[in-house]
């Protein structure tokens, strides 16, 4: 729904309305919205604030549990519907039990088609800030199944704007399916071939739906309303969908991202370790490690390449600030950065973790991500 907004600032004594332009009106997702769309207003509805689908048993509790803390709970999942968390906990118990096949979890607690089409849309539009937030979870009464509902798409189709603003974000492992590797639900889905097949079908179908011809037809339809407000940039954005489709296909050829552990100092040595990466085709993996005094890794003090194991050791350097960068490589030569990144004024430096050495001891950077 389009809204043409005019504002009169009475605090300044103005008698006229200023034109604030054209806006789109977005419906708030709550019980009323569920009912308006033919869904169950009495069902469970959670706004995902920051949740990687880990069990988090110290926080995700039943509402009548004496240790239940609503504020802590809503740091992860904001309760927008029924406050009975029984089936949420049952789902998380199964999802985090790796002896339970993902195929049975998808058949009971999630709708494969829903997950596949949701992820396909995020991948094609480059809406990268959806790994663990910017979505809703909905489950109707008398059903164990949870559905992911799309929410907050303000980060989509941002590649051109980021280039103009010279901001480094939405790159490296945030492109393609590797963006979802840190989330238990999505990781287990992607490790399941039947889901990957459904995802590929959904991506191809949505890609056809987002064709340049269809988008241009829609633009022509809206032109009579929005013509005077159009800028050139949105008209040139279709290429980004095509680029995101290519990135999605290529992301299965690369290793998956992983986390770098906190460095350990002992007996005059500095030990580094990290999680193992994963390759969809089962190719052999190796790791390249660089330790430097700067986040661009130009002032290098230690480096190793083609490491077969996710660890290495070097002599303990003097006090100061240091950065470790780790990349995984498969047998085909495709590389992937670690999940860790270092923030600067121009955005993210991927695959890099900052730490300090003070009096021979490791001190973590408070801004480590």
Regions found by a protein language model. Give the residues of each.
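Short beta-strand segments within Ig-like beta-sandwich modules, predominantly Fibronectin type-III
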Residues: 301-308
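Beta-strand-rich modules
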Residues: 316-335
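Exposed aromatic-hydrophobic patches
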Residues: 309-316
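Extracellular fibronectin type III
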Residues: 331-365
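Solvent-exposed loop/turn segments flanking beta-strands in beta-repeat/beta-sandwich domains
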Residues: 277-297, 335
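An aromatic-rich alpha-helical recognition segment common to small helix-rich domains
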Residues: 274, 289, 324-326
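Internal "kinase-insert"/substrate-recognition segments embedded within catalytic cores
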Residues: 7-120, 126
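Middle-to-C-terminal accessory/interaction subdomains
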Residues: 77-132, 138-286, 351-354, 359-368
């Amino acid at each position: 729904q389009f809204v043409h907004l005019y504002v009169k600032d009475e605090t300044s004594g103005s008698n006229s309305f200023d034109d604030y332009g054209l806006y789109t009106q977005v419906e708030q997702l709550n019980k009323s919205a569920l009912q308006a769309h033919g869904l169950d207003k009495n069902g469970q509805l959670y706004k995902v604030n920051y949740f990687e689908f880990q069990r988090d048993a110290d926080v995700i509790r039943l509402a009548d549990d004496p240790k239940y803390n609503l504020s802590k709970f809503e740091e992860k999942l904001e309760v927008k519907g029924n406050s009975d968390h029984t089936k949420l906990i049952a789902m998380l118990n199964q999802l985090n039990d790796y002896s339970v096949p993902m195929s049975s979890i998808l058949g009971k607690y999630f709708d494969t088609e829903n997950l596949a089409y949701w992820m396909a849309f995020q991948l094609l539009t480059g809406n990268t800030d959806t790994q663990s937030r910017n979505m809703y979870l909905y489950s109707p009464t008398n059903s164990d199944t949870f559905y992911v509902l799309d929410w907050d798409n303000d980060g989509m189709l941002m590649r051109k704007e980021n280039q103009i603003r010279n901001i480094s974000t939405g790159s490296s492992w945030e492109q393609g399916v590797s963006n979802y590797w840190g989330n238990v639900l999505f990781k287990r889905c992607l490790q399941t071939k039947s889901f990957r097949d459904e995802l590929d079908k959904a991506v191809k179908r949505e890609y056809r739906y987002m064709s340049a011809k269809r988008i241009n037809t829609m633009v022509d339809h809206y032109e009579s309303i929005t013509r005077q407000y159009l800028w050139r940039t949105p008209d040139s954005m279709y290429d980004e969908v095509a680029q995101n489709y290519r990135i999605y296909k290529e992301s299965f050829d690369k290793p998956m991202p992983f986390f770098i552990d906190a460095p350990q100092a002992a007996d005059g040595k500095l030990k580094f370790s990290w999680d193992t990466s994963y390759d969809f085709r089962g190719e052999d993996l190796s790791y390249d490690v660089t330790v430097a005094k700067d986040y661009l890794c130009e002032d290098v003090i230690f480096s190793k390449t083609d490491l077969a194991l996710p660890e290495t050791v070097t002599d303990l350097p003097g006090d100061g600030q240091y950065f470790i960068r780790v990349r995984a490589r498969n047998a085909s030569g495709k590389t992937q950065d670690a999940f860790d990144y270092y923030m600067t004024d121009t955005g993210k430096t991927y695959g890099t973790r900052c730490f300090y050495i003070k009096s021979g001891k490791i001190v973590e950077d408070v801004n480590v991500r």
